[in-house]
């Protein structure tokens, strides 16, 4: 063989067709004859190892802790008692946080409590407590808890980082407050015991959901290479911004940044990516393992420094510190 030429022979099918991109290789021999070979490149556009969507993680953890109909019924006799004490619990919680030096420093209240900030915090906490006492297990609540976790990672309006130890500790404080109010109300021990078991399970699932969001948000900040990601069209409404910086290590594949991006923005994942399941047979077993991978939906494009990655190396292309990604929905 005298020469090997890599040529792009990917064609865009109509929307109704199933897309199967290929790379075409033209091999010229010494005799001048040409042989053509094609190789599917679908795998070059795959994004694997994505975290579960927040709704999936929420339902998984509720099942794990056993928060089902019987557990809900155990909590119900205490709801009225806790609701009557709700405002008092909100006020006492932030009084406590303001007087503990570590949490006062986190909130920026070392010298004095900011009344506007305090009002914001109490409002959020009141809404959370109301939904908790309503035993809300909806997907909407799952997303709100996930978002609260990202706010703890300094992604909220005030950019305050709340270390996860204090989030975990706060859940313990609330369980203690619940138990205290039930005891003050002189509820029977036969009610308090099962109810505290139920509230512990429910708040543990909530804690996991917030830490889930926190850890994915912190992952966006890890790495020396700061990659600017620009969004266009309807994608901007889904992520509520026109661009964001995602950190990774220099030389990482584009796939790594996209994985962080679509972990962090679950609504964008549902819109831009198509989930596919793959079966992996086990040796000497009747069982098979199912794994999921994601591909861009038809018409979605990811550009690295202006070059469409469907035609330029796929998501395995390596990133440098000054690189930029642009993501376009269909029609752009």
Can you describe what each PLM-predicted range is?
Residues 7-11, 17, 35:
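Ala/Thr-enriched low-complexity intrinsically disordered regions
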Residues 131-135, 205, 209, 213, ...:
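Phosphate/oxyanion-binding loops and surfaces in catalytic or ligand/nucleic-acid-binding neighborhoods
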């Amino acid at each position: 063989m005298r020469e090997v030429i890599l040529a792009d022979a990917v064609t865009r099918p109509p929307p109704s067709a199933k897309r199967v991109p290929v790379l075409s290789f033209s091999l010229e021999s010494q005799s001048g004859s040409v042989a053509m070979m094609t190789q599917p490149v679908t795998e070059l556009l795959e994004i694997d190892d994505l975290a579960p969507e927040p709704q999936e993680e929420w339902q998984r953890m509720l099942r794990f802790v056993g928060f089902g109909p019987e557990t809900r019924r155990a909590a119900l006799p205490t709801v009225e008692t806790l609701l009557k004490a709700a405002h008092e619990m909100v006020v006492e919680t932030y009084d406590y946080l303001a007087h503990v030096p570590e949490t006062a420093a986190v909130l920026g209240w070392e010298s004095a409590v900011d009344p506007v900030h305090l009002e914001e915090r109490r409002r959020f906490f009141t809404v959370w407590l109301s939904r908790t006492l309503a035993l809300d297990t909806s997907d909407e609540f799952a997303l709100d808890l996930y978002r609260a976790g990202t706010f703890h990672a300094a992604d909220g309006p005030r950019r305050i980082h709340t270390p996860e130890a204090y989030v975990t500790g706060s859940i313990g404080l609330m369980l203690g407050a619940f138990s205290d109010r039930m005891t003050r109300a002189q509820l029977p021990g036969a009610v308090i015991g099962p109810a505290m078991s139920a509230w512990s399970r429910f708040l543990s699932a909530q804690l996991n959901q917030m830490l889930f969001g926190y850890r994915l948000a912190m992952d966006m900040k890890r790495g020396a290479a700061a990659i600017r990601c620009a969004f266009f069209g309807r994608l901007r409404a889904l992520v509520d911004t026109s661009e964001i910086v995602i950190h990774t290590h220099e030389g990482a594949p584009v796939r790594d940044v996209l994985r962080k991006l679509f972990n962090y923005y679950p609504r964008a994942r549902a819109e831009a990516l198509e989930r596919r399941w793959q079966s992996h047979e086990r040796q000497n077993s009747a069982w098979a393992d199912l794994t999921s991978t994601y591909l861009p939906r038809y018409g979605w494009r990811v550009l690295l420094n202006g070059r469409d990655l469907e035609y330029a190396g796929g998501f395995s292309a390596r990133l440098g510190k000054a690189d930029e990604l642009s993501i376009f929905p269909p029609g752009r």
